[in-house]
């Protein structure tokens, strides 16, 4: 059970869904200095990544998560949400084909992607001379390994490129998305993307079909830093979506995106989704006591339930297992 309240923290026994057997990764917001928060986290056996603007990511032993949550220096803690791949747009539907004859082809612009990776050997992502258009690949699946343009060019000259740059795109989703946006180079022009002469940067998420919101935040920070280093205007594409959260901009991921968009030279593009009629959410007014029944399959080890309310009303929630034995009682 996960109860979201703006007062402090959003944690529950379901944090195992975003962890391994010993550690959990969470996003936080704090009004203290990065050095102070880093020291607090290190004292609890964890690692802190500063994202700027008070945001950060903490990797911490599971048994110390409650201690982190009770620190007066931490304003809010949030478990990462899962975001899934989306790519249902086309150039024709977006009226891009009508401007292909113009000179607006993305020259001098860095387009960053947070996705499943990229097939860097594909001719659509090379210049006319065969060199790569990819400035960086940031592979979170390899523990955050960064491959540079020089390394990618070296790999392209090799008979065994993956021995030099081993990052791949297993599902092909990221490659497909980059193709829609940036395909160009040595392919038929009818398959060109929106910005066929732009530079490319890829953040590969550490899951094959979905990403955690903490990975998205790491990726945004990386791409913004690289855009500054290259002194190039930056657009970030995330063809990922989720039905987790309140859908009102209150999650730390949403707040971080809003803050970055308002303060940095960046345009952030996200997938709109195609699930408006899927009925993933339900709303209503609680009158006295409401009982809701649901089934959990025997092969489901973890179930996450998100409930949202306005700030003032008090709500008490009790979760009962078969036999009417109280499992947990929460008040928000």
Which ranges hold each PLM region?
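Surface-exposed beta-strand/loop patches in noncatalytic accessory domains
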Residues: 46-47, 314-331
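Conserved small/polar residues in nucleotide/adenosyl-binding loops
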Residues: 1-5, 328-332
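Subtilisin-like serine protease catalytic core
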Residues: 100-214, 231-232, 301, 312-313
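Autoinhibitory N-terminal propeptides
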Residues: 4-56, 63-102, 110, 123, ...
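Active-site-proximal beta-strand/loop segments in catalytic clefts of secreted hydrolases
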Residues: 60, 80, 114-117, 183-184, ...
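Substrate-binding/access-modulating region of protease and related hydrolase catalytic domains
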Residues: 206-286, 300-316, 322-323
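Non-catalytic, beta-strand-enriched accessory regions in extracellular/secretory proteins
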Residues: 286-297
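Stable alpha-helical elements in mature extracytoplasmic
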Residues: 33, 37, 61-64, 121, ...
């Amino acid at each position: 059970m996960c109860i979201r309240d703006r007062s402090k923290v959003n944690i529950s026994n379901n944090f195992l869904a975003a962890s391994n057997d010993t550690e959990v990764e969470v996003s936080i917001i704090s009004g203290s200095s990065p050095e102070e928060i880093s020291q607090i986290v290190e004292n609890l056996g964890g690692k802190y990544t500063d994202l700027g603007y008070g945001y950060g990511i903490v990797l911490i032993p599971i048994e110390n998560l409650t201690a982190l949550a009770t620190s007066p220096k931490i304003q809010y803690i949030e478990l990462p949400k899962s975001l899934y791949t989306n790519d249902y747009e086309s150039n024709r539907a977006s009226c891009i084909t009508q401007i292909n004859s113009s000179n607006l082809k993305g020259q001098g612009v860095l387009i960053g992607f947070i996705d499943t990776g990229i097939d860097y050997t594909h001719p659509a992502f090379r210049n006319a001379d065969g060199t790569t258009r990819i400035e960086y690949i940031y592979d979170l699946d390899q523990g955050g390994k960064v491959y540079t343009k020089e390394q990618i060019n070296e790999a392209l000259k090799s008979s065994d490129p993956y021995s030099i740059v081993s990052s791949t795109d297993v599902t092909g989703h990221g490659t497909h998305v980059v193709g829609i946006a940036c395909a160009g180079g040595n392919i038929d022009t009818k398959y060109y993307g929106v910005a066929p002469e732009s530079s490319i940067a890829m953040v590969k998420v550490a899951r094959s079909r979905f990403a955690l919101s903490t990975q998205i935040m790491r990726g945004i920070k990386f791409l913004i830093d690289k855009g500054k280093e290259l002194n190039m205007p930056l657009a970030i594409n995330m063809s990922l979506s989720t039905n987790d959260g309140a859908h009102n901009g209150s999650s730390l991921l949403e707040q971080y995106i809003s803050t970055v968009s308002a303060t940095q030279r960046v345009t952030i593009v996200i997938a709109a989704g195609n699930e408006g009629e899927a009925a993933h959410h339900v709303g209503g007014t609680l009158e006295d006591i409401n009982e809701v029944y649901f089934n959990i399959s025997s092969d489901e080890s973890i179930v996450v339930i998100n409930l949202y309310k306005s700030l003032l009303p008090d709500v008490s929630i009790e979760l009962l297992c078969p036999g009417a034995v109280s499992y947990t009682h929460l008040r928000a």
